[in-house]
Structures are given as structure tokens and as C-alpha cells.
Regions:
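Sec-dependent N-terminal signal peptides
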Residues: 1-4
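N-terminal low-complexity, Pro/Thr/Ser-rich intrinsically disordered segments
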Residues: 15-54
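Structural signature of tandem-repeat unit edges
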Residues: 51, 58-60, 68-90, 101-117, ...
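Consensus positions within tandem repeat domains that build extended binding/scaffold surfaces
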Residues: 93-95, 119-122, 142-147, 165-170, ...
Length: 236
């Protein structure tokens, strides 16, 4: 007899594909920061005001020269540029040196009674320069400051000077007056400081250089107008 037929196994259902995730809802777009505009700024280091040149790189003003047309130089206490005020604190070395400014012909200089630091050779060889005033708060006449200013007749207000540098007044052949200079207060006199001042005369009497600590060679050479008996401290 025929064998009973086996029931067919139910067909396996094909595995269903995983459900696709719905894309996440997009949030508000991030705002990009506004682009910064670069603005170039430049620090002022030098400028010219009223025909006088200044360096202000240190934060204060130092005089570095002037226009060749200037004959009467007056140093101000302060100077303003681009809405900023600077205190005038000094005069740069060689600022008015004839060797660097051969067309400049200064006649008078007024330092305004300011406590300036004045560099070497500041006025050397200014052959038209006749008078210098306003040195009330200057304590040192720097090396070669007035060397060969042959028309210079008077330097005033030297009462606070304690140091006269190398050749400071050498070959100032017309100089007759160093107003207020107290030789008793000088602590240092440089080499040839007063050499060849042919028009200068000073009667010292019996004079002691009480404060003097340094006296270099030929300090008073060829300056016959200084007379008297000079007494030097034993430490010299």
C-alpha cells in the first residue's frame, strides 16, 4: 500500500530588512562669528613739530635736530602730536653738530630752564651761535657740547652745573661770560674743557676747588684770562 505522505514544512519567511532610521531633525544652523577686520596700527616714534625734530620711542620726547631755517632755537617743556602730549627730556648727541648739519646756522638757543640730558657734540661747531640761555636746571655740560662755537659770547644760568666735559668750551674764542658757573661746586673738569678761550677772563683770587674730584690734562690751557691762586684738594 502507498505510504502516507508527510506534511510539507512551512516555508521560512525571508528575514525582514532592518527598518531605516528617520534622519534626525536638523536644528537651527550655527551662526558663524563675524569676521574680525584687521586694522593696522603704527606706533609713532618720531615727528617734526614747529621745525624741531623729536624722537619719542621711549615715551618721552628727545630733540634730534631742527630745520636748517631755524636761527632761534627754543626748547619747549612739552610737545603734542596726534593728540598725545610728550614731555621733553633731552637733546640727542650730535643733534645740532655742524659736522652733520652744515647748512644750519643757529644764532641763539634757549633751553627753557628744563632739566634736560644733553648728549655729546650737541652744538659743536655752530659758528653763528652767540648766546645760550635757560640752563638753570642743567647739571652737566657734556663732552664737546660747545666745542668751536667761535662766535659764542655768553652762556647763562650755569648755577647747577657740577661737571664740565671733555673740550666742552674749547676754542670758544669769543666767550666772555659763563654766568653763574660756580667753580667751587664742580666735581669734574674734563680734558681741555676750557682750552683756548682767548676772550674769557675770570679773577678767582685765592680759590679752592672744594668739591673737585677729577681734573684732566690741559683743562685751562691757553686761557690766560683766568687769574688767581688756585688751591686743589689733596685728593686730586
Amino acid at each position: 500500500s502507498a505510504s502516507p505522505s508527510r506534511p510539507e514544512a512551512p516555508a521560512e519567511a525571508a528575514p525582514s530588512a532592518p527598518a531605516e532610521k528617520a534622519p534626525a531633525a536638523e536644528g537651527p544652523a550655527e551662526e558663524k562669528p563675524a569676521e574680525e577686520k584687521l586694522v593696522a596700527t603704527y606706533a609713532v616714534t618720531a615727528f617734526t613739530q614747529d621745525s624741531i625734530r623729536y624722537d619719542v620711542s621711549s615715551g618721552d620726547a628727545v630733540v634730534t635736530g631742527c630745520a636748517d631755517s631755524v636761527t632761534k632755537l627754543v626748547i619747549p617743556e612739552t610737545v603734542t602730536y596726534d593728540d598725545k602730549e610728550y614731555k621733553v627730556v633731552g637733546i640727542q648727541e650730535h643733534a645740532f653738530d655742524w659736522a652733520n648739519h652744515r647748512s644750519l646756522a643757529l644764532e641763539t638757543v634757549d633751553l627753557g630752564g628744563l632739566p634736560l640730558e644733553i648728549g655729546e657734540y650737541a652744538f659743536r661747531g655752530q659758528k653763528s651761535l652767540t648766546t645760550v640761555t635757560g640752563m638753570d636746571n642743567i647739571t652737566a655740560v657734556s663732552d664737546y657740547m660747545f666745542t668751536a662755537c667761535s662766535a659764542l659770547t655768553s652762556v647763562a644760568d650755569l648755577s647747577k652745573v657740577t661737571s664740565v666735559g671733555i673740550q666742552a668750551f674749547m676754542n670758544c674764542s669769543s666767550l666772555t661770560t659763563l654766568e653763574g658757573l660756580n667753580f667751587s661746586a664742580l666735581t669734574s673738569i674734563g680734558q681741555q674743557a676750557f682750552n683756548n678761550m682767548k676772550s674769557f677772563s675770570l679773577e678767582l683770587g685765592e680759590h679752592t676747588f672744594d668739591s673737585l674730584e677729577f681734573l684732566d690734562i690741559r683743562a685751562f690751557a691757553n686761557t690766560a684770562g683766568i687769574t688767581g691762586k688756585v688751591v686743589l684738594p689733596e685728593r686730586i
